[in-house]
Structure formats: structure tokens, C-alpha cells
């Protein structure tokens, strides 16, 4: 039996772990308890194999910042959270599941598109889109589903503009994204959705070769360094991550503010707090809730435990972002907190490339909703809100609101 195949102790917690009923904004209680009592512990994965669970802020940063922990999904023992996840990553890995130098080479092709200066220049256009969506949502109505009318369309429109993807195809790519991110999707369902999305993007790349524009896919084609499949794989990452994460953060942030009226009132009274409040919401909600996977390439001491070469690791950024040593009172939402040390976007060389764009989108989305909808409220009881515990990216499936 190899190191990677060792089973966890019988009492080891299972991942993905479930949140407690009635506590939709808190990490899974098993993960929280591990962070308190055994910060580096063994866990059981869906297929019965085991990995290490790293739960404290200091240790999570240590793993994610150490090149001895590989992001290469092709290494034996890499900890996949689901069978479908293994299908996605194992057959067409993005640069997020590669190590340097190949990771750095591919990432550099996109860096200029997501630097703060360029993203800030997009702020007026993102604001225009946000206001247009609110106009459409509120015209002749007093209620709507925030997810379908605002939270999902806004980042979808923005990422389509950046990539050069026709927005009229949004239903197609949003549905394939849903399948890819559903934890219960079978490998066959994932393979079909992935193949359809990759073929769509490869076909788009071929179109850009004939009719170029100034968007990302067209520029990747013009570089001549990648074939259509590689461009499609890179486009898939940007398209799925570029709309799903911000959409769910927008909806979940709105809900948690409505559930914390004192914090909502403070933001309304002090709009200048919105920029910092976005960092606090990213910390508090941590929608990448099932962990960031790595695999050790040599024996490494983390949190007093030796993680052996070939053993998988899940970095639980949800519990790291509640670490009381870094964020005192971290189980409470405080929109005035300095939350800049959060790891919601990861840490190290693989941290989220699109975080400057996500910040701008979230700042504009929250400020616009608070400004345009002074009587914003839930249209159904909180208990009826359907949470996305079944998805790799946490959030809500719908959010009925009224104004």
C-alpha cells in the first residue's frame, strides 16, 4: 500500500463536510472543531482514500506558499473532492492545476488583463451595467430573484466582454458551469458538459482567427503559442470562475447583510466603508468552502505534523478565515474590520488571478444595490432560501427580494 492510499482513522472527518442546519454562513462544524482541537488532521475523501486537512490561517498560508506542495493534478495521490472533479481536472487541467514553470508561463499570458490599473479603468462600464440591470429589474415590479436578475448577469456580462464571448450564449455556458460545479454530478455528466464547453470555446477561437477583436481569446489566438484546445481550456477557467464566484458572492453578501441589519445600516450610513466591507464579506463567507487541494512532493512539517511525500492536503480557507488569532471575533461580521489578511483568493503563486476584477464587481454591486434599493428586503422567510451546499462554489440558488 502506497502512502497516498493509506486510509484515515475510523473517526476521521469526511470531506466535503456539511454545514450545520440553521448556520448557513459558518464553516462546517467538523472543520471548525478540527481547527480548534487538531489543526492538522486526517480526513476521508469520497472514494475512501484519505488526505490531510489543514485548518489554521498560518498553516494554510504555509502550505499554499511552499513549492514543495504541488498543484499538479496528475500526481498520484492528488486529493480530488469528487469523482466529477477528477474528471474535470484530470483530463483537461488548467494552469491552476500545474506547477511552475508551465503554470507561470500560461498565467503570464493573462496577467496584463487583470492588473489593478486595467480593471479600475473598467469601473465606469461595470457601473453602467449594474445600473442597467437594476433599472430592468425594478421597472414595473416590486420583487424579483436577485440571482437571475442581477447577481448572475453582472459578472457574466463583464467576463463575456473581456473574453469576447457572445453574451447571448450565457444560458449555454451557465448551464454547463452548473454541471461542472455540482458536487453530485457523475463523471459522465461532467465529461459531457466539459466537452461541450471546450468545443464551444475552441470553435470561438477558430472564429477569432478569421475575425479578430481586442478581447482575451482573440489575443491568445494572435500570440500563436497555444492551439485551440489549450485556448479553450484557458477560456473555460476564466469563463466559469469569472462569473460563478462573483455571482455567488454578490447574492450571499446581500443575504448576510439583510440578516445583519446593524451592519447593513452602517454601510448605508457610511458608503465609504463598502471597499473594506467587501474584504470582510470575502473573509466571512469564503465561498470556496471545500478546500484548496495540494500534494506534498517531499516530507514537510506543518503545524507539528509531518506530511509525507505523496500525501494529499486540503487547505481549508473557510476555517483559516475565521482563525481568532488573525481575526479576533471572526465568527461575527464586522464591515469596519480590517480583513485584508484573508485567504479567500488563496495564497502564493496560484492565488486568484482575477481578484482585482472580483473586488471591483463586488464593490459596485453592493454599493449599487444599497443606493438604488433603500427598502431592500427578503421576499420570503430566511428558512426558505435554497443554499448551494451541493456546489463547489457556495452561495444561494435563488434569492427572492422585494423593495
UniProtKB/Swiss-Prot annotation:
A single Gene Ontology molecular function, please? Answer: oxidoreductase activity, acting on paired donors, with incorporation or reduction of molecular oxygen
- Keywords for this protein: Heme, Iron, Metal-binding, Monooxygenase, Oxidoreductase
Under Enzyme Commission nomenclature, its number is 1.14.-.-
Tell me the enzyme class.
Answer: oxidoreductase
Enumerate the cofactors the protein uses.
heme
Residue ranges of region Disordered? 1-24
Pfam families hit by this protein: p450
**Would I find Magnesium among this entry's keywords?**
no
* Matching PROSITE patterns: CYTOCHROME_P450
**Which InterPro entries does the annotation name?**
Cyt_P450, Cyt_P450_B, Cyt_P450_CS, Cyt_P450_sf
Could you tell me what induces this protein? By herbicides.
* Residues annotated as binding heme: 352
Family according to the record: Belongs to the cytochrome P450 family.
The protein's job, in short, is: Metabolism of a number of sulfonylurea herbicides.
User: What is the protein named?
Assistant: Cytochrome P450-SU2
| Organism for this UniProt entry | Streptomyces griseolus
Amino acid at each position: 500500500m502506497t502512502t497516498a492510499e493509506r486510509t484515515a482513522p475510523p473517526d476521521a472527518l469526511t470531506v466535503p463536510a456539511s454545514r450545520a442546519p440553521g448556520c448557513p454562513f459558518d464553516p462546517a462544524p467538523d472543520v471548525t472543531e478540527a481547527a480548534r482541537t487538531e489543526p492538522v488532521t486526517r480526513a476521508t475523501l469520497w472514494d475512501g482514500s484519505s488526505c490531510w486537512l489543514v485548518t489554521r490561517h498560518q498553516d494554510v498560508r504555509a502550505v499554499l506558499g511552499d513549492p514543495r506542495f504541488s498543484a499538479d493534478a496528475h500526481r498520484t495521490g492528488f486529493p480530488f473532492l469528487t469523482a466529477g472533479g477528477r474528471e474535470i481536472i484530470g483530463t483537461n487541467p488548467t494552469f491552476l492545476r500545474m506547477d511552475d514553470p508551465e503554470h507561470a508561463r500560461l498565467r503570464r499570458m493573462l496577467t496584463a488583463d487583470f492588473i489593478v490599473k486595467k480593471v479600475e479603468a473598467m469601473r465606469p462600464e461595470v457601473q453602467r451595467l449594474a445600473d442597467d440591470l437594476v433599472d430592468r429589474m425594478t421597472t414595473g415590479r416590486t420583487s424579483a430573484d436577485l440571482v437571475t436578475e442581477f447577481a448572475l448577469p453582472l459578472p457574466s456580462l463583464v467576463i463575456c466582454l473581456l473574453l469576447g464571448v457572445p453574451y447571448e450564449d450565457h444560458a449555454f455556458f451557465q448551464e454547463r458551469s452548473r454541471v461542472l460545479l455540482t458536487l453530485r454530478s457523475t463523471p459522465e455528466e461532467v465529461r459531457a458538459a466539459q466537452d461541450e464547453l471546450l468545443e464551444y470555446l475552441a470553435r470561438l477561437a477558430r472564429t477569432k482567427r478569421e475575425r479578430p477583436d481586442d478581447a482575451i481569446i482573440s489575443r491568445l489566438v494572435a500570440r500563436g503559442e497555444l492551439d485551440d484546445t489549450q485556448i479553450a481550456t484557458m477560456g473555460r477557467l476564466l469563463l466559469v470562475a469569472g462569473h460563478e464566484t462573483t455571482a455567488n458572492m454578490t447574492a450571499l453578501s446581500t443575504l448576510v447583510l439583510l440578516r445583519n441589519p446593524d451592519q447593513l445600516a452602517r454601510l448605508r450610513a457610511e458608503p465609504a466603508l463598502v471597499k473594506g466591507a467587501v474584504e470582510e464579506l470575502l473573509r466571512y463567507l469564503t465561498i470556496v468552502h471545500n478546500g484548496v487541494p495540494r500534494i506534498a512532493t517531499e516530507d514537510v512539517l506543518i503545524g507539528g505534523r509531518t506530511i509525507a511525500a505523496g500525501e494529499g492536503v486540503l487547505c481549508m480557507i473557510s476555517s483559516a478565515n475565521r482563525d481568532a488569532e488573525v481575526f479576533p471575533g471572526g465568527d461575527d461580521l464586522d464591515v469596519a474590520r480590517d480583513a485584508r489578511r484573508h485567504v479567500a483568493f488563496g495564497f502564493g503563486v496560484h492565488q486568484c488571478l482575477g481578484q482585482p476584477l472580483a473586488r471591483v464587481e463586488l464593490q459596485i454591486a453592493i454599493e449599487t444595490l444599497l443606493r438604488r434599493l433603500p427598502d431592500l428586503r427578503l421576499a420570503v422567510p430566511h428558512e426558505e432560501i435554497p443554499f448551494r451546499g451541493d456546489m463547489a462554489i457556495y452561495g444561494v440558488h435563488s434569492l427572492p427580494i422585494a423593495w
